[in-house]
Amino acid sequence: MSSARALRSIHFPSSMAERDIARARLAYEECLYLQLALRLRNDGGMVEVVPYTHTAGGHLTALRRALPFSLSDEQEAAFQDILHDMCDGDHVMNRLLLGDVGTGKTAVAACVLAVAADSGTQSCVMAPTGVLARQYADKTGPLLSQAGMSWALLTGATPAAERERIHAQLQSGELDVLFGTHAVLSDNVTFKHLSLVVIDEQHRFGVGQRNALRAKGPGADLLVMTATPIPRTLALSVYGDLDTSIIRHRPVPGAGVSTRVLTESSRDLAYGAIREAHAQGQQAYVICPLVEPSDSADDLEDVPGIARDDEGRVTVSVPLHDTATELDRLRLALPGLSVERLHGRMPAGEKDRVIDAFKRGEIDVLVSTTVVEVGVDVPNATVMVIENGERFGLAALHQLRGRVGRGSVSGTCLVMTHSKGNGGVSAAQDRLRALEKTSDGFALAQMDLRLRHEGEILGYRQHGGVTLRFVDLDATRILSNGPIWTRSSSCGMLATLTPWRRVPCAMRSPRVIDISSRRSAEDENHRR
């Protein structure tokens, strides 16, 4: 069927069968053009990009010895997949490492950094907050030093003299690894030989920011890590533009987190959970979307994880909680407990002071914005209360939930919802119901994709709108029907189509690797 006939038939079909054939024809064409565009973009358009060929050596061996543990089977499998990408020299690595909090993504990343150093090149790790970047430096840095590698930390709070020293060491090649925040995107930050870019908590960065860092090392391999890929990232992995490795199990099983969605009438249950945790010597978080009572919906525009409509706008129809008012309210409601607040507008030194006090157990309840979403590790914190839960996206909610239950005691996440009326409330309630039902980050990402759509696959919007008019992504079906991806990339396109759910097959077979499933299959074969 020609394109012109398909357009006529989809509007004026003579039968349901003709309508389905027309939609299949247009879906095929849509997928074909998308795949050609992705291939052209990955090949650098008219500019040839030569991939690096990395080699593993002494730094990696020394780093493995320095680790206080051996990599789990799933971690090792993920590392081997990444190592294969880095060493084959056929293409530039573009890989997503997906794993929930505590699955050991950081240990895998440390091994990858050692491979880049073994190759005589540099690597950069970008984190969304100074807290997380410093955590990398504090935990991973000493291991790199034991492996004979040099590293530095660059954030917005780095003193000018130290910043200049780091710039000079990067340009000379003296530094092997740079940990940093958005500060690494500065034009003054130049590398002698950047061959590896690692981006943690990938959902907190925009497309332009990721591209800007990668541009500092043409041909550099890219590894992005997250617990819940945003819709655009999941769509790219589905279309074969982003190879994916999944680690489903923690090397050391945690106590777990139970999640409940509460309305305002059940607020006493939330306060009761905080009191009970305090009685047992444990701590709690209370998360608010705003910093000050004078803030408005406009102040949410730059807040990561805030839910938006299909046009990317923040819409508010219910009162929003702020940290200042909540601090006063909790001090009245919870007498005898030490309650402090934390937010991104505080000076870096003050933020560090509050976080350190919370880690030492000097603060019982920490009222905060999403600044604690990543990089804050307090095993003694067991209760998380999230105000205006309907205002946050699934990725942010899942990450916030991951701040509790990190020790030997199970955690409790209580999501307060204030939604009334219609509009976007239904989608918000769908998000919260999904959060209650599962703790699987990838399952939540699939739900996020269905609710918020894929955004601009070839552009900069990471969710909202529908780029594809005739193709409907369903990651569950795509990943469960794995054999279709093994067909030759030269065979063209294959679409698994039903009247209302259409799944494309990429021209290039993406390597979506569920390590836990592969291990189970290997175990089953061994038993046989």
Q: What are the language-model segments listed below?
A:
Residues 4-8, 25-34, 369, 398, ...:
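Non-catalytic, well-ordered alpha-helical scaffold segments
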Residues 50-98:
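Conserved pre-motif I regulatory segment
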Residues 88-433, 494-496, 521:
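Inter-lobe coupling/hinge segments of SF2-like helicase ATPases
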Residues 31, 63, 75-78, 82, ...:
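Conserved hydrophobic/aromatic pocket- or pore-lining residues that grip, position, or stack substrates
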Residues 412, 420-528:
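C-terminal accessory region of SF2 helicases/translocases
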Residues 18-27, 66-69, 127, 131, ...:
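Generic amphipathic alpha-helical segments used as scaffolds and interaction surfaces in large
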Residues 50-57, 248-251, 407, 457-462:
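Flexible hinge/switch segments at interdomain interfaces of large molecular machines
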Residues 1-66, 460:
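Upstream accessory/linker segments immediately N-terminal to the RecA-like ATPase cores of bacterial MutS
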